[in-house]
């Protein structure tokens, strides 16, 4: 068994959450450990549909949060729904800045669809229904270009 010592930020997992944590830790040194090549041992790459966020002038995080709480039939914490809805537009724009090829209209704005219990068109899609794969490819590319992140693929941890 190989023992390694590291005094930076350790991120375990190569899905969207792990990749996002590695990027957010900048400028601290990060070691990201994944049991498989990035994006292959996670469910993030399989996600379909799109990302819901209040991105249009006719929408707002408050409206998005209200729709989420109503659709949750009593199971959604209103405070957490409000936080996620408030952070959503920035998160989608950040993913787009990483290169996620969200569908756009002729003016370059996000092409949004209205789905499920959403009261407004707020689902930003990628190539119709390939959001997970395309978003992961963009975020993986950003991680690989980040000098502060060391990626260890095909590794397993047996203890901390």
Task: Explain the meaning of each model-derived region.
Residues 1-6:
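A short, basic/flexible loop-to-alpha-helix module at the beginning of a structural domain
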Residues 8-32:
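N-terminal Rossmann-like FAD-binding beta1-loop-alpha1 element of flavoenzymes
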Residues 35-159:
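Conserved N-terminal/central alpha/beta ligand/cofactor-binding core
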